[in-house]
């Protein structure tokens, strides 16, 4: 993952399945050269990340030291804090995180780190019941006993163990945790029953889909990934949609909801980003929902207050787009994003005007792909 910290530094967050990865960062020197900074970070596995103050924070579900009488291990939430200026790192575990975080017995992970209104917002993603959660309080949290796994199976991010219940039993709701600071203590938990949980998915990665408008209103976007669960009891009935938390509020705006699928011709979003004001850039599926990000080759612009949705015009045909950059660069009210195609053309940077939803081709990139777009200024 390539992540720009403003216009000062570029981070290469190294993700390795199940183990540590070496993370490096870069700057521009006074001569215009990209140079690596001295410090390398060994950070543990992460499934989401974001910026809060002076830190880049990564997070994932982890095993803790807590066990029940049968040796079943409780889940927790593991954090890595990378202090950008000091080039130091530390790890922590979320207090009270993981097991029974929402009061329904399920363990959770987070999707995204959003700094807004002087607080830290993150989407809470319910993961189902661990073996520890299945056994907790004599099984009181198991709604559907036949969903408890009877043998080990799956692979990669879909692997499971005998005795756990994979996937949430509560697919028709979304939760956001609001923390007063980056210590991840004393959260305010807010719930909506108008959208399903809020995150983009690509295998084990959980992409941020909660973003603040310039006025501090937090918009919560849901692709409704629970639709693709194999058991209908774990499938959400809710379409891909948008909910809102007003700036400074401790609850969802009961009067606000937008049905993305009704406006898009039946397609959900994959992931999204804030551009400017209350404009958001949405990467849209055009071949139906999946948890691998495949077939998400359209872009749309959504304006929060007016609830307007427009597909972006001026991009290459969706059938020849193979990928977009992992996030846009915003400047002067426009979004810039890399586009890679399969028609033999070189990758290019496109400028998207949110007020018109029109894309214009800009720089051609002499490379095979474009991971991210940003701008760096010289840092001593």
Where are the regions a protein language model picked out?
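Beta-propeller fold detector
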Residues: 33-43, 86-103, 186-196, 252-262, ...
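Beta-propeller domains
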Residues: 170-177, 182-252, 258-260, 264-268
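Hydrophobic, glycine-enriched assembly/anchoring segments
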Residues: 323-326, 330, 339-380
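Intrinsically disordered, low-complexity segments enriched in Gly and acidic/Ser/Thr residues
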Residues: 253-345
């Amino acid at each position: 993952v390539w992540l720009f910290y403003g216009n000062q530094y570029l981070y290469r967050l190294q993700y390795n399945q199940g183990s540590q990865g070496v993370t490096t960062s870069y700057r521009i020197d006074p001569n215009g050269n990209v140079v690596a900074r001295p410090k390398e970070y060994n950070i543990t596995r992460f499934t989401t990340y974001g910026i809060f103050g002076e830190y880049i924070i990564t997070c994932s579900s982890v095993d803790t030291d807590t066990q029940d009488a049968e040796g079943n291990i409780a889940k927790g939430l593991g954090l890595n804090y990378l202090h950008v200026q000091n080039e130091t790192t530390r790890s922590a575990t979320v207090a009270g995180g993981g097991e029974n975080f929402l009061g329904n017995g399920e363990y959770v992970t987070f999707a995204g780190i959003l700094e807004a209104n002087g607080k830290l917002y993150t989407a809470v993603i319910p993961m189902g019941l661990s073996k520890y959660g299945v056994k907790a309080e004599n099984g009181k949290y198991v709604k559907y006993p036949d969903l408890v796994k009877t043998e080990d199976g799956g692979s990669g991010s879909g692997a499971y163990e005998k005795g756990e219940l994979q996937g949430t039993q509560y697919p028709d709701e979304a939760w956001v945790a609001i923390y007063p600071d980056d210590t991840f203590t004393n959260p305010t938990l807010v719930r909506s029953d108008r959208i399903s949980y809020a995150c983009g998915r690509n295998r084990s990665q959980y992409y941020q889909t909660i973003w603040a408008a310039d006025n501090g209103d937090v918009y919560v976007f849901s692709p409704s990934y629970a639709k693709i669960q194999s058991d209908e009891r774990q499938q959400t009935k809710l379409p891909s949609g948008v909910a809102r938390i007003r700036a400074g509020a401790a609850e969802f705006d009961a009067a606000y909801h937008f049905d993305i699928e009704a406006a898009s011709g039946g397609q959900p979003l994959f992931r999204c980003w804030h551009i400017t004001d209350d404009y958001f850039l949405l990467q849209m599926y055009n071949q139906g929902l999946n948890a691998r990000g495949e077939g998400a080759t359209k872009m749309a612009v959504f304006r929060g207050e007016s609830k307007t949705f427009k597909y972006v015009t001026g991009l290459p045909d969706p059938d020849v787009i193979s990928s977009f950059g992992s996030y846009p660069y915003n400047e002067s009210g426009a979004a810039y994003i890399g586009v890679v195609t399969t028609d033999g053309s070189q990758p290019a940077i496109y400028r998207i005007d949110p007020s018109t939803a029109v894309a214009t081709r800009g720089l051609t990139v002499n490379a095979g792909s474009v991971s991210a777009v940003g701008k760096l200024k010289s840092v001593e």
